[in-house]
C-alpha cells in the first residue's frame, strides 16, 4: 500500500511544463510570488561573515537542481545571446559558480561564484508600465552574467546597472541581493532602464519580502548608493514624485506598485513585520514605515536564520492554524515567510577570515524548509554529492541556457535527485501536517541539530589541515558533504516507508 502511495505521489511530480527554446524565454510571470531575503552585515553576524538567507518562491513543475559549473577560458571574447535577441560581448573567461537552479524559471536561480560573489533576488512589482528595451532586453541572463564575470559585489552591482541601462529590464521590478565576503547590496531594478542600489551597513541587517525597501537615496554618496543618474528626474517626469508636496525623494514610494489597502493580507507587510520583530526584539506596528536596514538585538548566527525562514507566525495573532491544529500553515489567508510556493531555501555565509574551501558556504534546503532539513554545502568541495544535481559541470553558454528552459532530459532522470524524495515527503506532510511535522522534526531535525552542533569543530579541523595539506583538506570536506547528503537521503527513505 505504501509503495502504491509513493508511486502516486511521484507520478504527481512528473507533469512537464512546456519550455521555450534557447532564444525565446517565457514572458515574466509569477511576479507576486513571495520570496524572502535577510541580509546580515559582517559586523552584525556572530562570526564576522556576511550572511544572506533566502526563501525562493515559485510555481510549476520545477526541479531544484544544484550544479557546480567549472570556470572556462574560451580563448577569445564571446558574443552571448541574452534570450530575446539582444547580444552581449563577454570576455574570454567565465568564473566557476555554484548554481541553485529552478528549472524553466526566468527569475528564480541563485548563484555563488568562485570569488564568493552571491546573487539572489525578490520580485518587487513596480508601477512602470512602459517597456523600454533594446532587442528584447535582459531578464534571466542578468544574474548569470554577474556570476560568470564579477569579482566583487560592488563590481557586480555596477555591471548589472550597465546591463539594465544598455538593454532595458524585462520584468516589472525586482530587488537583487548581491553580496561578497566584505559587503552586501540590495539593487532595485525597474522595468526599462532605471535602477538604484543601497549598501547594507556592516553593523546592520536588512529584510525584504516582495516590495521595494530602499527609501531615501543619495547618489552623491557613492560609498552607500549607486543608481541611474536620471532616477529622480524620471520619477518627477512620470508624475510619481512631487518634491514640493512630498519633500525628500523616497524610491519605494516613487517606483513601487501600490499594494493592497489591507496591510494584514497584502502578502508583504506581515512578513516584513515578522522579520523586524524577531531580529530587533522590539515591537513594531503593522504598517509602520519600516527601515531599509536596522541594528539587530544581538549578533546573528547563520544557523539561527533557519528558524526565521521556516516561520508561519507561530505564537502570534496571525498563527492561522493554532499550532497546526487545523492543518498546514502554508496555505492560510496570511501569507507566511515559509509558504506553499517556497521551492528552496538557503543560508549563505561569506567569510573573509576562512581558508578558500570554507570561505563561501551554504545551509541548503531543496524544498520548503519547514518539512525538510538544511544540509551543509561549501563552494570549495571538489564536486557535488550524488543526488544534489543533474547535468554536466563544464561551461557552455548555449547548452546551459537550453537545458535550463528545456528541462525534459533532466526531468527524465529526476528519480536520481534528493529533491524528488524531499518533494514526496513534503506532499505527504501537507496532507497530515501536525503528525508528519512531528516525525520530520524527530528524524530530520535531530540530524540537522547534529550538523549545526558539529560545524565549528569541522571547520576548525579543515582549516588546520588546509594549512598543511590543501588537497587532503578539500578531499575531507567533499567527503563530509557527501556523507551528509547520503545520510539525509536515508532518512527520507525512512519517512516514506511508513
State each model region's role.
Residues 156-165, 305-309:
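Short, well-structured alpha-helical segments that form the helix of a local strand-helix-strand
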Residues 263-331, 335-340, 431, 447:
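Accessory, solvent-exposed terminal regions and/or long lumenal/extracellular loops of proteins
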Residues 428-498:
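Histidine-centered catalytic/metal-binding microenvironments
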Residues 25-37, 321-327, 334:
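Short, Gly/Pro- and small/polar-rich lid/capping loops
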Residues 8-17:
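Bacterial N-terminal signal peptides
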Residues 1-9:
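Bacterial N-terminal signal peptides that target proteins for export
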Residues 318-450:
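Substrate-recognition/cap regions that form aromatic- and gly/pro-loop-enriched pockets
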Residues 26-139, 159-293, 297:
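A contiguous strand-loop segment
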Amino acid at each position: 500500500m505504501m509503495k502504491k502511495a509513493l508511486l502516486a505521489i511521484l507520478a504527481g511530480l512528473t507533469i512537464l511544463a512546456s519550455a521555450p527554446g534557447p532564444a525565446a524565454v517565457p514572458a515574466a510571470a509569477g511576479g507576486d510570488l513571495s520570496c524572502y531575503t535577510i541580509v546580515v552585515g559582517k559586523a552584525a553576524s556572530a562570526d564576522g561573515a556576511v550572511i544572506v538567507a533566502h526563501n525562493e518562491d515559485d510555481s510549476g513543475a520545477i526541479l531544484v537542481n544544484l550544479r557546480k559549473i567549472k570556470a572556462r577560458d574560451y580563448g577569445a571574447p564571446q558574443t552571448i545571446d541574452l534570450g530575446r535577441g539582444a547580444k552581449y560581448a563577454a570576455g574570454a573567461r567565465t568564473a566557476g559558480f555554484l548554481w541553485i537552479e529552478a528549472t524553466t524559471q526566468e527569475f528564480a536561480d541563485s548563484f555563488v561564484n568562485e570569488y564568493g560573489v552571491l546573487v539572489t533576488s525578490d520580485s518587487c512589482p513596480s508601477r512602470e508600465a512602459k517597456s523600454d528595451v533594446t532587442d528584447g532586453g535582459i531578464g534571466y541572463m542578468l544574474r548569470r552574467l554577474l556570476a560568470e564575470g564579477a569579482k566583487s559585489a560592488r563590481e557586480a552591482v555596477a555591471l548589472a546597472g550597465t546591463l539594465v541601462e544598455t538593454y532595458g529590464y524585462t520584468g516589472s521590478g525586482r530587488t537583487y541581493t548581491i553580496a561578497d565576503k566584505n559587503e552586501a547590496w540590495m539593487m532595485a531594478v525597474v522595468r526599462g532602464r532605471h535602477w538604484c542600489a543601497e549598501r547594507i551597513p556592516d553593523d546592520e541587517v536588512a529584510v525584504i519580502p516582495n516590495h521595494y525597501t530602499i527609501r531615501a537615496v543619495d547618489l552623491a554618496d557613492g560609498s552607500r548608493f549607486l543608481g541611474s543618474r536620471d532616477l529622480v528626474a524620471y520619477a518627477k517626469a512620470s508624475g510619481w514624485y512631487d518634491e514640493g508636496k512630498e519633500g525628500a525623494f523616497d524610491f519605494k514610494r516613487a517606483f513601487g506598485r501600490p499594494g493592497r489597502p489591507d496591510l494584514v493580507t497584502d502578502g508583504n507587510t506581515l512578513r516584513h513585520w515578522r522579520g523586524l520583530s524577531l531580529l530587533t526584539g522590539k515591537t513594531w506596528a503593522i504598517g509602520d514605515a519600516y527601515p531599509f536596514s536596522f541594528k539587530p538585538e544581538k549578533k546573528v548566527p547563520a544557523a539561527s536564520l533557519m528558524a526565521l525562514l521556516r516561520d508561519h507566525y507561530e505564537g502570534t495573532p496571525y498563527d492561522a492554524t493554532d499550532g497546526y491544529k487545523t492543518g498546514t500553515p502554508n496555505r492560510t489567508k496570511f501569507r507566511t515567510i515559509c509558504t506553499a510556493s517556497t521551492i528552496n531555501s538557503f543560508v549563505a555565509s561569506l567569510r573573509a577570515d576562512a581558508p578558500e574551501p570554507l570561505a563561501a558556504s551554504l545551509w541548503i534546503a531543496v524544498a520548503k524548509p519547514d518539512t525538510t532539513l538544511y544540509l551543509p554545502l561549501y563552494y570549495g568541495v571538489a564536486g557535488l554529492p550524488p543526488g544534489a544535481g543533474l547535468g554536466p559541470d563544464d561551461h557552455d553558454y548555449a547548452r546551459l541556457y537550453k537545458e535550463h528552459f528545456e528541462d525534459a532530459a533532466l526531468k527524465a532522470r529526476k528519480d536520481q535527485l534528493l529533491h524528488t524524495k524531499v518533494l514526496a515527503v513534503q506532499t505527504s506532510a501537507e496532507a497530515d501536517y501536525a503528525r508528519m511535522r512531528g516525525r520530520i522534526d524527530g528524524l530530520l531535525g535531530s540530524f540537522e541539530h547534529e550538523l549545526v552542533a558539529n560545524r565549528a569543530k569541522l571547520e576548525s579541523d579543515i582549516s588546520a589541515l588546509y594549512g598543511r595539506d590543501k588537497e587532503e583538506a578539500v578531499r575531507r570536506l567533499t567527503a563530509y558533504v557527501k556523507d551528509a547528503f547520503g545520510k539525509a537521503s536515508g532518512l527520507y527513505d525512512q519517512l516514506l516507508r511508513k
